[in-house]
Design a protein with these regions (language model features):
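A contiguous pocket-lining binding segment that forms or flanks enzyme active sites
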Residues: 159-169
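Active-site ligand-binding patch in enzyme domains
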Residues: 3-14, 19-159
Length: 169
């Protein structure tokens, strides 16, 4: 199977951390600027973030108690055609299905709107699948209890035509 080329684009402290107080010091400002400028250099169609990063500035927090669904959605990948047509994506690694969204895409200052694709495991509740469909958020199953990264990458390529993905942090 074909998979996208993965670019690992990280801004780290000297001790290898991708988060912390070092982001707030003036000496980091030039590095943050260069980090942002390099994002577009790579020409990636998608950026993959973990649950913590999504909660830190992309998702609308965690979903609360979801209403019981009358008809259980099938446990199959779901692709929103409108979102797919956007051609720019944010892939959210959310194995348990806990992230909340206000719609099918996320728009950050200085970046084009990106369709959200949730990477889930089979453990996710049927109510969450229904919620994602109502929000227009696509989702892919990539493992039973743990995320299978190879499977996820293959599906991103096959179902969304993603050839280059950025793992950012």
């Amino acid at each position: 199977m074909e998979r996208p080329f993965v670019v690992c684009h990280m801004l780290t402290s000297l001790d290898g951390k991708i988060d912390g107080t070092f982001f707030g010091v003036p000496e980091t400002v030039p590095a943050i600027k260069a980090y942002g400028e390099l994002r577009s250099f790579y020409g990636c169609q998608a950026t993959l973030y973990g649950t913590t990063t999504m909660l830190g500035g992309y998702a609308e927090g965690k979903v609360g108690q979801l209403p019981t669904v009358m008809s259980t959605p099938p446990r199959a990948d779901w692709v929103n055609p409108t979102g797919k047509a956007m051609g720019n994506f944010i892939v959210a690694v959310d194995p348990q299905g806990q992230l909340a969204y206000s719609g099918l895409s996320i728009e950050k200052k200085g970046r084009p709107a990106a369709h959200v694709i949730e990477a889930l495991t089979e453990q996710v509740a049927p109510e969450y699948l229904s919620y994602l469909q109502n929000q227009g958020v696509s989702y892919l199953f990539a493992g039973e209890k743990r995320l299978n990264c190879t499977l996820l990458l293959e599906k991103l390529h096959r179902l969304f035509g993603i050839n280059k993905l950025m793992l950012a942090g």
